[in-house]
Amino acid sequence: MIVLHHLKNSRSTRIVWMLEELKVPYEIKVYDRVDGRAPPAYTKLSPLGKSPIVVDDGVTYIESAAILEHLVRKYGPSFKPSEEDVAELEKYELWMHFSEASLMPFIWASHVLDLSVNMTPIFFRYIVRQFVNGIKSKYLSKETFLNLDYIDNHLASNEYFAGEQFTAADPQMCFPIFAAQRDYLSQKPYKNIKRWMRVVSDRPACRIAAEKVEDNTLTLFSDVERYSHPPTPPPEQVRSDE
């Protein structure tokens, strides 16, 4: 029996999605965060305390890509291009690594910097906010948009990330794209990314996973229209030409 140790609002939602695609029996054990971190019971499973964690036949697996590769190899080889499909396999391998190695670091760094502003004493918060905004505008945002442009261009000629077939690379890419929705996907059309979001969020396995985990990662992931246009600034920020 596969046991997924699920930390709420975390990367493990992609594993629930993949398990539903595979249609294999599994159990979910849900953990609530404590002060934004994994609880002690979770760190007993792995000293890193990072989500996701999967236990399969007594063996503990960590890291999303490694877990997905294990599940596909053991339970669903059709969710990975075959060795004969070299072009598709190379796409698959690229996006399985791109998710956390290229895109997510910039989004996560921005998130941590925003948290640092909120944790700063109020008297110094304005100064820290200006410093953070400078880092984000001059480096992090530029790199994030560069990555999203690359993704959108790839999806212009590919139905899914590994080509014309849904693979484990699609759930793997869902988390950073979800994380980019609010601050980035509303700033440019990104019609191909949003087309992909609509397609995969309509898959029954994605919908079932969203209901099972009861957090917003996959639920908001399907709410693509919400991020199709730049947000309207509040009235006091609207400039008038009159």
From Swiss-Prot:
Predominant location category: cytoplasm
Where Phosphothreonine occurs, the residues are: 232
On induction, the UniProt comment says: By heavy metals such as cadmium and mercury.
Gene Ontology annotations of biological process type: glutathione metabolic process; removal of superoxide radicals
Q: Is-annotated flag, keyword Phosphoprotein?
A: yes
Enzyme class, first EC level, given as a word: transferase
One GO molecular-function annotation for this sequence?
glutathione peroxidase activity
Localization recorded for this chain is: Cytoplasm
Q: What sequence ranges are listed for the domain GST N-terminal? A: 1-79
> What catalytic reaction does the record list?
RX + glutathione = an S-substituted glutathione + a halide anion + H(+)
Source organism, top-level taxon: Eukaryota
Q: What is its EC number?
A: 2.5.1.18
A Gene Ontology term for the protein's cellular component: endoplasmic reticulum
Reply yes or no: does the keyword Acyltransferase apply.
no
Entry keyword set: Cytoplasm, Phosphoprotein, Transferase
Purpose of the protein: May have a role in the detoxification of various heavy metals.
What does the subunit comment say?
Interacts with sad1.
* Family, as annotated: Belongs to the GST superfamily.
Q: What is the protein name stated in its UniProt record?
A: Glutathione S-transferase 3
Q: Which organism's genome codes for this protein?
A: Schizosaccharomyces pombe (strain 972 / ATCC 24843) (Fission yeast)
Gene name, per UniProt, is: gst3
